[in-house]
Every structure is written in C-alpha cells, then in structure tokens.
Amino acid sequence: MSPPGLVVVDKPAGMTSHDVVGRCRRIFATRRVGHAGTLDPMATGVLVLGVERATKILGLLTAAAKSYSATIRLGQATSTDDAEGDVVRSVDARHLTSQAIEAAVGGLRGDIHQVPSTVSAIKVAGKRAYKLVREGQAVELPARPVRIDRFEVRDLRAAGECVDVDVEVDCSSGTYVRALARDLGAALGVGGHLTALRRTRVGRFGLEQAYGLDELAECPRLSYSLDEACLLIFGRRDLSADEAEAAGNGRALAAAAAGNGRALAAAGIDGVYAACAPDGRVIALLRDEGARTRSVVVIRPATMQDGTS
C-alpha cells in the first residue's frame, strides 16, 4: 500500500485532470487517488493530488486561493471563452492602447461578481453546464462573488488584427480565468478569449514543488506525507493522549481527557487546524465552534494510533 500524502503534479496540456489521476493510480498502484481543483485540458501547471487517506483533505484544498499565468487574445470571442471553442465574433483590436487595456484590467480587480463560463462543470438542475451546452440547450449561469487580488499585465503584442495580453492572476477559489478574458474583451468592446493558462499555485503549493508525470513514473514519490501536508496547510494544536484517542474516534465534541464527558475546549485558532498526538502525528482536523470544537476530518482513527502509519 502506498503511504498517504499529497503529490503536486505539473499537469501537461492535452490531459484532463481525471487523466492525471488515472496515470497516478497506476504509478502509485492504488485506486485511492483524487485531485483538488480541476484544470481544463488546455491548461498546464499545479494540480494537487491526494493519495490514500490524504484524499480526505482534498475538499478543504479546493477552497484555497490560486495563481495563474495566462494569455488573453483581444479581438475575438469564442463559444467557450477559450481557444478550444468556435470564434463567434471578430473585431479589429489594433486601436487598443496599453492605457486602455490597463484601465479595463483594473476594473476587474477586487471583489467582483462573475458569470462563470457556460462551458463549465457547474451543475444546472443536476446536470453539468457543459453537457447541456453540447445538447444544444441555452444555459444561463448566475453571477457569483469572487475576489481578484492581482490582475496584472505582463506583456502586449500584436497578433494580426488581435492583441495578445500576457497576465498574472491571483484569485479566490471559484474564479474562472476564461471568464476574466471574456469580460476584459467585453469591457474593451472587442471580445476576448483565453489562449493559454498555467496554474502556478494552489494555496501553499507551487510549481517549485511540482513533479512531472514522467518523473513520477520513473520514481514514485510524495511531495508531502499526510502529516507534513496537514501541518503545512493548517494551524496546529497539541492534544493529550486521552484527547487524541477521543479525536481519533471522531468524538472531539465530547473528548473527555479524564473520562468525565466534558467537551474539548476551543483552541482559539481561526479556521480548521491539525490536532496532534503527543508523538507529533496528526490525529484529526478540528474547528472551533463557540467554546467547543468540532471534528472536520479524522486523519488517523483510534484503531490506527498504535501503529506507525
């Protein structure tokens, strides 16, 4: 059995995120592999995978902020807001000045309401939006709040009657960079779509920690053990042996260190935090609720605490 942990993969273009999971299932010889945060097939870059019990924490990673390098083509709008769709509108964009582009980019920073791209995995009445679009159905997705902490122009260059804009983006989870490209083009009156996308960071995990799939095939290895990952991502709380046993049973709300049924007191730590046994191993992820705690994920059940895994 593979040890539990996270693998930071540099996803190549042309593969779906599920393709990467399938490849890593073969590399690590386990079916228990999942990913945090889908990348479109045309995109490259950071894809965080969980192996074995580390799949339990992937849902918490999907909410992490993300960073991207991207190229936006101004002067063409497409059916998918990226280069994989059909061109539905072309406008000569050669008149655009760098000042006009910078001003439009600035208008898309901060807290905004973004309409996701219709060709997306968002569910509408139980079906993925992209499937409805393929069936010829009209799809209207509601705008939702996202935060764009950085949207910076790195380079501008002519591409025929279009203008290609290289940008860097730091954004909240749930942001569609394709939609940013669309909205930038709309703000400038010329249309726009995404021609390249590379994710450079997911939360604490960046390209500097990422492995290529060929590297992993030659030498399967984790980027972080499950304990290392939990302590990197979350705050830490040290438990007594009795508290650790209770947390391992999922009884954090009634973790009686002395068998008296009292709830485990709040730690005063914001958000989810890692609860550690006296030997330093992570037992569970907890969250304060008022004066008490709630178990979010049991990392190491009580039945495993006598072992070394």
Swiss-Prot record:
The keyword Lipid biosynthesis does not apply. The active site is at 40 (nucleophile). Its EC number is 5.4.99.25. The keyword tRNA processing applies. It comes from the Bacteria. Keywords: Isomerase, tRNA processing. Disulfide bonds: none annotated. GO terms for molecular function: RNA binding; tRNA pseudouridine(55) synthase activity. InterPro entries: PsdUridine_synth_cat_dom_sf (IPR020103), PsdUridine_synth_N (IPR002501), PUA-like_sf (IPR015947), PUA_sf (IPR036974), tRNA_psdUridine_synth_fam2_C (IPR015225), tRNA_psdUridine_synth_TruB (IPR014780), TruB_C (IPR032819). GO terms for biological process: mRNA pseudouridine synthesis; tRNA pseudouridine synthesis. It catalyses: uridine(55) in tRNA = pseudouridine(55) in tRNA. Belongs to the pseudouridine synthase TruB family. Type 1 subfamily. PANTHER family: PSEUDOURIDYLATE SYNTHASE TRUB1 (PTHR13767:SF2), TRNA-PSEUDOURIDINE SYNTHASE (PTHR13767). Responsible for synthesis of pseudouridine from uracil-55 in the psi GC loop of transfer RNAs. This is tRNA pseudouridine synthase B. It comes from Mycobacterium avium (strain 104).
